[in-house]
């Protein structure tokens, strides 16, 4: 019997599409896809509303991503004409095989990364102009918090498993994932869980606040830093209030509770300021209602979410593609887990795009 590490290497070298998603004890690998659904603005509703019979298999699920543009369209927020590489708005796969990798990925490629210099999609003057316009919008009360997207691009072919394995060693994140398909790959070291739905229970875990690890800075000192830092505290409070409000739209009255408030989570190179919010879903709520209420994730957009999305979309000249969309799975029994796609690389048509 082959070890899971050997099976991973064999699957990678076979050229077959596969997905790796961080689990509590290691990683889950999904492959042997029997269906691939490319989403667009017309079919996303039917995809989310369709019901499948569960055979109580670990592979009774669809796994994939919703892009930023698709999520905007789902809540009737229009995006003006932007530069677009025509990458799919969302893709979901039905796996027939799942492997559990209970330790590190331990994969190293002999190939060296070859890429040209990175080009940034917005120059300093343009960024400053947008920044100053948004400052005026904050002063006039149109938004309270807003987050601009910047992209770095280079011509390159990448080995996604090699990149993902190395990133997992240097920056292991609880919502990390990678997708390798024939014509594209995605790598993300996302730390943020946007939705975990089990039965009628739903949780969200907003992150707002980051400090780099330095010598002598432990979790207690990091917590004191966040508490004393007015900017970090106010930003966190705003995002938590917004996520509670989003949950309240789909949950039973009085069921939305803050279970963990302003705790510090430790990563290899930094500390995050985190809260955990739980709720009990209303009986009539469907998965499409949850997606519409919670996505795109507010902590990487700003607040109030709807108005802020419109402001961003009118100023940003290039499509975000996967960035600030969501990756995860929908089980046949209706349970879901989705992250927010940040700290990501999209490789498509031999262009690597970091957002």
Predicted regions: what is each one?
Residues 1-355:
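Extended alpha-helical targeting/anchoring segments
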């Amino acid at each position: 019997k082959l070890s899971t590490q050997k099976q991973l290497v064999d699957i990678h070298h076979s050229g077959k599409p596969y997905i790796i998603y961080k689990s509590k004890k290691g990683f889950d690998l999904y492959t042997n896809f029997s269906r691939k659904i490319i989403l667009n603005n017309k079919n996303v509703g039917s995809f989310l509303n369709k019901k499948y019979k569960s055979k109580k298999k670990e592979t009774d699920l669809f796994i994939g991503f919703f892009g930023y543009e698709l999520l905007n369209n789902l809540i009737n927020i229009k995006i003006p004409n932007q530069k677009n590489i025509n990458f799919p708005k969302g893709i979901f796969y039905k796996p027939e095989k799942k492997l559990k990798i209970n330790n590190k990925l331990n994969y190293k490629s002999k190939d060296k990364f070859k890429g040209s210099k990175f080009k940034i999609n917005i120059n300093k003057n343009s960024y400053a102009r947008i920044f100053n316009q948004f400052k005026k919008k904050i002063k006039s009360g149109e938004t309270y918090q807003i987050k601009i997207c910047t992209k770095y691009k280079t011509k390159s072919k990448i080995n996604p498993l090699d990149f993902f394995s190395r990133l997992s060693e240097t920056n292991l994140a609880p919502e990390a994932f990678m997708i390798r398909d024939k014509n594209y790959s995605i790598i993300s070291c996302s730390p943020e869980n946007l939705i975990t739905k089990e039965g009628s229970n739903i949780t969200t875990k907003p992150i707002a606040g980051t400090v780099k690890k330095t010598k002598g800075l432990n979790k207690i000192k990091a917590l004191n830093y966040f508490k004393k830092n007015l900017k970090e505290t106010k930003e966190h409070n705003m995002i938590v209030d917004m996520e509670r409000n989003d949950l309240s739209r789909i949950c039973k009255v009085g069921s939305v509770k803050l279970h963990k408030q302003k705790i510090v989570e430790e990563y290899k190179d930094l500390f995050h300021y985190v809260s955990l919010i739980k709720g009990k879903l209303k009986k009539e709520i469907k998965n499409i209602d949850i997606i519409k209420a919670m996505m795109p994730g507010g902590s990487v957009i700003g607040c109030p979410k709807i108005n802020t999305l419109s402001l961003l979309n009118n100023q940003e000249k290039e499509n975000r593609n996967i960035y600030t969309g969501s990756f995860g799975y929908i089980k046949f029994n209706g349970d879901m887990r989705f992250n927010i796609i940040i700290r990501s690389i999209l490789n498509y048509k031999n262009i690597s795009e970091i957002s």
